[in-house]
């Protein structure tokens, strides 16, 4: 496992004008040394972390030796979003409500700058990680060769904002806030068909607990004490690369090859929403490409349908 390393930033100005006295940005490096090979930045999703490869790597089917993102060919850099507390309580932050996806993207650029790299071959991320990738492209529109936002959008939708409200109510009123919020979120990431295929309305034990209930409770317990989930939900709501900016100019300015990847059954970031963004980009640039994963599994398909995702990414990384 690659060692977790840290960069400490002092007096970081946030989008809302607050100055954060100290921010610790942790990360892991995989593959080739930064500067010796094309750099691939991988942004983790809501409950992910910087461990993208290996036995516990959340994208181990995509990244590693002789895989689509081949660590024998690329330098792979994965940051931890400040506040996720991955393997370090020091990575927790108290005033999570002050941070937006823009602020996280800006911190990631500061982290990349510490390696003295001016050009990034690819920034890829799913869900929240993809939203941060969009923000990174808007901040430095000429610095990324390939932008790959997966199962995400460049602006929070009404559906997403509404579900953030439900999450906030759970977090503020439940006796087991993170546990219960996670259970609700798990249903947003799947579809009725996905759960039916997985559980078949079967009982888990003689006490009358259904397998789907046991699965949901397990995920609630697993996340408890591991994440500040409320921080993540708030950041999703704050996604908007056009905030206080000229929409058309932002779109025109992004020089990257933009590969928008949707899931046809995603309720969280719908395929139609992502396709609409693609069509808008095509009005001004010819550097956008639309791809759609077919799956019964909904939003989480980007963590499940690896064969389809591999086929989409193969031409980019070969």
Where are these regions (language model features)?
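Catalytic active-site module of serine/aspartate enzymes centered on a nucleophile-bearing elbow/loop
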Residues: 275-318
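Conserved alpha/beta-hydrolase "acid-adjacent" motif
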Residues: 267-273
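Conserved acidic catalytic loop of the alpha/beta-hydrolase fold
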Residues: 102-121
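Short beta-strand/loop motif that positions the catalytic acidic residue
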Residues: 254, 260-262
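Alpha/beta-hydrolase-fold enzymes
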Residues: 143-222
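N-terminal cap/lid subdomain of alpha/beta-hydrolase-fold enzymes
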Residues: 28-86
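Conserved hydrolase catalytic core segment
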Residues: 119-158
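Catalytic-loop region of hydrolases
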Residues: 1-39
């Amino acid at each position: 496992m690659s060692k977790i390393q840290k960069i400490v930033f002092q007096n970081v100005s946030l989008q809302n004008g607050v100055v954060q006295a100290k921010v610790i940005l942790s990360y892991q490096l995989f593959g080739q040394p930064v500067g010796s090979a094309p750099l691939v930045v991988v942004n983790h999703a809501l409950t992910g972390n910087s461990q993208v490869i290996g036995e516990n790597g959340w994208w181990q089917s995509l990244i590693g030796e002789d895989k689509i993102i081949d660590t024998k060919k690329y330098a792979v850099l994965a940051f931890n979003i400040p506040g996720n507390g991955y393997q370090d309580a020091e990575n927790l932050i108290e005033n999570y409500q002050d941070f937006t996806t823009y602020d996280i993207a800006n911190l990631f650029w500061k982290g990349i700058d510490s390696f003295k790299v001016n050009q990034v071959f690819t920034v890829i991320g799913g869900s929240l990680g993809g939203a941060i990738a969009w923000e990174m492209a808007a901040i430095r529109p000429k610095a990324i060769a390939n932008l790959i936002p997966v199962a995400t959008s460049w602006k929070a939708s009404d559906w997403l904002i509404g579900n953030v409200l439900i999450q906030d109510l759970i977090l503020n009123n439940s006796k087991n806030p993170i546990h219960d919020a996670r259970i609700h979120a798990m249903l947003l990431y799947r579809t009725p068909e996905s759960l039916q295929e997985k559980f078949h309305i079967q009982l888990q034990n003689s006490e009358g607990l259904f397998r789907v209930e046991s699965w949901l409770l397990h995920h609630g317990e697993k996340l408890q004490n591991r994440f500040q989930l409320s921080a993540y939900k708030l950041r999703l709501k704050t996604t908007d690369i056009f905030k206080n900016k000229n929409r058309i100019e932002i779109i025109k300015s992004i020089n990257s090859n933009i590969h928008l990847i949707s899931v046809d059954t995603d309720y969280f970031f719908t395929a139609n929403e992502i396709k609409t963004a693609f069509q808008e980009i095509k009005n001004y640039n010819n550097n956008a490409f639309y791809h759609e994963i077919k799956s019964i599994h909904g939003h989480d398909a980007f963590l499940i349908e690896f064969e389809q995702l591999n086929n989409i990414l193969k031409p980019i990384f070969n």
